[in-house]
Amino acid sequence: MGWFIVFIMVITTTGNFWFTSQLSRSEHRHQAAENTQQAATFIRYMNAINDYLHQHQERRTAGGRLTSAQLGIPGTDTVSHIISQQRVFVWATETPGLMAALREQSNDSALLGRVENGRLLDTAGRALSITLPSVIPDHVILWMN
C-alpha cells in the first residue's frame, strides 16, 4: 500500500510541475502578443501623425497635439504624443518586452529611445543631446522624428 501512495505522490508532483510550466509559457506568450500589439499601435500612431503633418505642414510649426479624429484612427490610452520644436514625440509607458517589440517592428530605428531623469537615452543607454518637452514623463519609451 505504501508504494501506491508514493506512486500517487510522484504522479501528482509531475502533473503539478507540467501544469505550472505550461501556465508560465502561456503567460509569456500572452505578454509577448500584448507587446507586439502595443508596438503596432505605437507605430500606427506615429505613421498617422506623420501622414497628417505631411498634408498640414503648418501644424508642425504650430506644435501641440492632434486628436484621434484628425488622425483618422481610434484613440488610445497607451500611446501619447506632442509636436514640439518641429519634431514629433510619441511615447508609451515602458513595460517589460515593449522596447524589444518596437525595435523589431521598427527595424531597430535610431529614433527610438527611453526617457530617464528627463534625458533621452538611445537603445544602448547613451544620452542624446535632444531637449525634450517637459510634458514627457520619465520611464517611457519614446520615438521621435
Residue ranges and their predicted role:
Residues 35-59:
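N-terminal alpha-helical signal peptides/signal-anchor transmembrane segments
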Residues 16-40:
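Aliphatic-rich helix starts adjacent to a transmembrane/signal segment
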Residues 9-12, 30, 51:
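Short, contiguous, well-ordered secondary-structure segments
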Residues 54-107:
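Extracellular/periplasmic head regions of type IV pilus-like filament subunits
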Residues 23, 28, 48-53, 57, ...:
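N-terminal pilin/flagellin-like segments and related low-complexity appendage regions
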Residues 1-25:
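N-terminal single-pass transmembrane signal-anchor helix
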Residues 90-145:
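Short, surface-exposed interaction loops/tails
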